[in-house]
Amino acid sequence: MVNTERFIQQAVSEIRELTADARVVMALSGGVDSSVCAALAAQAIGERLEPIYVDTGLMRKGETDRIRHLFGHLNLRIVDASDEFLDALAGVADPETKRKIIGERFIRVFEREAEKTGATVLLQGTIYPDRIESEGGIKSHHNVGGMPLGIAFTQVLEPLRDLYKDEVREVAGALGLPREIQHRMPFPGPGLAVRIIGEVTREKVAVIREANAITEEELVEEFRPWQCLAALVGLGTGVKGDIRLHGWIVAVRAVNSRDGMTADPLEVPYPVLFKIASRITAEIPSVARVVYDVTPKPPATIEYE
């Protein structure tokens, strides 16, 4: 349990003191972590904050428009770097290599924007579970293990580095952020890339973006999972009409958790699972099969890569 009032005071003071008169680039994704960072930084340094949203081409359906609507008042800069990210991932199948590539590209985009604004400090929404998983070798996070050496920023600030996800939500409430942001499901920094087993292609991204949207539509409002997602896990044989199809296999996953360190699979009623499978296979012609993942964390991680 975090003392939100004390934390906010300390975080605002820390950001103000460490940045001095420098301009600060804010990595704003629209999730609760980066949104809390933005609110803290806005209190601390006002117009010296340069909030930037990078469209990596690996975002959820409608995400960029949503970000523009929610955060346009913060002098938000939207950078479309989708081709840059997807081209860099071409031919890469190893999950750690994908994460490293996304992390490096992510930082390079911010370096470019910093040069335009004069910003020398990078602010990130890294939370405690991110650091534990990176330091423990479980998997790297795009804003921790993926950061390349020789970074051009003089400082990288992570004011949420010691908080768990539920504590970040408490701080969001204390800051008066909208409930939509407070209770936003976690979304991985590398985006849909970690929901695609193997090489990331534009076709696969389009498939899994739509499958994720369907999964969220069917589960979020009724069941309030801590996180739910769809992942592209391989190819399988199916039949549509009289035609034999070698199409994608989509795995649906929904879990409950307190802090992301452990998680239990959500017991979704069979009729709901059947509806999700029916919608995904009907609305995405290239999908041949849908399965539901009931593995807890541990031994599995919540995301697939």
From Swiss-Prot:
Disulfide bonds: none annotated. CDD domains: GMP_synthase_C. The keyword Hydrolase does not apply. The keyword Transcription regulation does not apply. Pathway: Purine metabolism; GMP biosynthesis; GMP from XMP (L-Gln route): step 1/1. Pfam families: Asn_synthase (PF00733), GMP_synt_C (PF00958). One of its GO terms (cellular component) is cytosol. Gene3D superfamilies: 3.30.300.10, HUPs. ATP binds at residues 29-35. One of its GO terms (molecular function) is asparagine synthase (glutamine-hydrolyzing) activity. Keywords: ATP-binding, GMP biosynthesis, Ligase, Nucleotide-binding, Purine biosynthesis. Residues 2-184 form the GMPS ATP-PPase domain. InterPro entries: Asn_synthase (IPR001962), GMP_synth_C (IPR001674), GMP_synthase_B (IPR026598), GMPS_ATP_PPase_dom (IPR025777), Rossmann-like_a/b/a_fold (IPR014729). It catalyses: XMP + L-glutamine + ATP + H2O = GMP + L-glutamate + AMP + diphosphate + 2 H(+). Its EC number is 6.3.5.2. GO terms for biological process: asparagine biosynthetic process. It comes from the Archaea. Catalyzes the synthesis of GMP from XMP. Heterodimer composed of a glutamine amidotransferase subunit (A) and a GMP-binding subunit (B). This is GMP synthase [glutamine-hydrolyzing] subunit B. It comes from Methanosphaerula palustris (strain ATCC BAA-1556 / DSM 19958 / E1-9c). The lineage of its organism: Archaea, Methanobacteriati, Methanobacteriota, Stenosarchaea group, Methanomicrobia. The gene is guaAB.
